[in-house]
C-alpha cells in the first residue's frame, strides 16, 4: 500500500492499493457536497476501512492495471439543490476500460449504477445510495474534421467545452438549449432542445454512439448498426447503459445577430401563424402572464462584426440580488408577485411596448440565457397549433379573468387559482422534428404530425425555499398540458403518472422497455424514478434500487435514500452475492 500525502498536515490525498497481480485501486475519502467541488480530505489512517470488505476483496482479484477511481462520503446535489443523495461510492473513470471495470465490478458486487453530469435536472432521476458515476474527467474531443463537420468526443465533455473547442477549428453545434453546463451525454439522454423550426432536438445531430452495457461490454450503435439500440439510447434516461463516446455532426461556426422586442401577448399571439416563428432561424419567447406581455427574441446568421449585448439588469450585482430578495419576500407575501413581475420585467427588458435591445455574438454565446436562481422547471411539448389556446387558458386561470374581460377564454382547469401567485416568465420555444430524416428516439417527446411547442413553467426557489404555489400551479399546468396532447420534458419536474406516460408513448414505450430489458436484464441502471414513470408495474429487477425514504436536507431540498434489491424478502437477501465465493462463481461464469 502506498500513501501519498497532501501539502496540508495530517491530511491524506489518496491511497493506492496494488493487488497481488499488480492491479490498482485509487481511493479517496471526501466530504464534497457537489462533484464540481474539490474534495475536502479527511484525516484517516485507514481510509480503506470505509469500503465494504466484499468490494475490496473483489478489487484485489483483478489482474490488470486499470484504475478504479472511487470516493466515499460524497453527497450529490442537483444544481437547484432540490434533491440530494449520498452514494456508497462516487466514481470518476477516465477511460472506457475504467468504465467497463466499474460495470463488471458492480455486477459482481450486486450494485446499481447511476450516471450524473452537472446535475442540472432538478428531479431525483440521478439520486442513489449505491454507486454514482461522473464522467467529468472523460472529456476530450478525439477528432474533428473541419471539412465534413464530423466530431468524435468522449461523453463527459460539457457543452461549453464542446463549443469552445469546436470554435477553435471553425465548427459549431447547429443548435443549443438555454444553458451549456450539461455533459453531452446528459443532454442527449434527456431530449435537450433549443428553439428553432429549422432544427430538431440535440439528438438529431448524433451519428453514432458507444455505450457500455450491464455485461461490461461496449457496443457501437448508429442508424446503420444496432439501430434499435441506437434509437433507445438517444433518449436513454440513464437506464440502458453508460454512453462513453459520441460522434456528432457539427456545422461551420456562425455568428448570430439577435434582437428582442417587448410587446403585448395579444399581438404576439395574433402573429402566431404568420411570421412569429419563421421570421429568423432562431426564435424564442418569454411570456409574462400578469402584465400580459411578451419578449420575442429573434436571431439570424450574419457576417457582421460582434457587438456585445447591453448590460442586463439580472447580470448586475444589484439587480441580481434585488430580484432574489423580492422573490424571497414573495415567499411570505405572495400577492406582491404580480408587482415583482412588472418591476423586474421593466428593469430587464423595458417598461414600454416596443422596447428593443440587440447584439451580435457567436452562436455558442447568443443562444444561452442566465438561469439565475435555484428553481423548479416543468416543461411540456405540445403541438405548435395549440400554443395560443394554451397561453390564453393559462392566463384566464392565473388572472381570474371573467367573461367581460376581452382576453377571457374558458380555461377548463378544475383547480382553484384563488390565492395562487406564480413566478415569471413562462419560456416558449419550438422545434421541428416531424420532417426529420434521422431515426427518432423511442422516447422522443416531440410531435410527429407538426412542429412542437415547448412551454416551460419556472418557479424560483429563493434562498432554496420551495414556493408555496408549487404544487397547485403545476397541478393545473399539467392538467392543461395533458388536455392539449402534451408530453413532459424528461429532465424537468413533473408529477404525471406512469399510466399517463404509457398512454402518451404507447408502442414506442413498449419497444424502449424491450430494448432496455435486453441490454440490462437485472436493472443495474434502474432506480425509483424509472420505475415510477417509465417501467410500469412489472416485476422488480434484481439490481433495481428502491427508494426507502426522504429527509429534509440541512441546506434545503430533500435527501433521498434507497437500497438495491430492497423489495426482496429476507430469505432472498440471504442468498445474495456478498461472499467471496459467490463473486468467484460469477466471475468464472463470465469467463466461459
Which residues does each predicted region cover?
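Noncatalytic alpha-helical scaffold of FAD-dependent oxidoreductases
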Residues: 2, 12-16, 25-27, 31-592
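Low-complexity, intrinsically disordered Ser/Thr/Pro- and acidic-rich segments
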Residues: 21-23
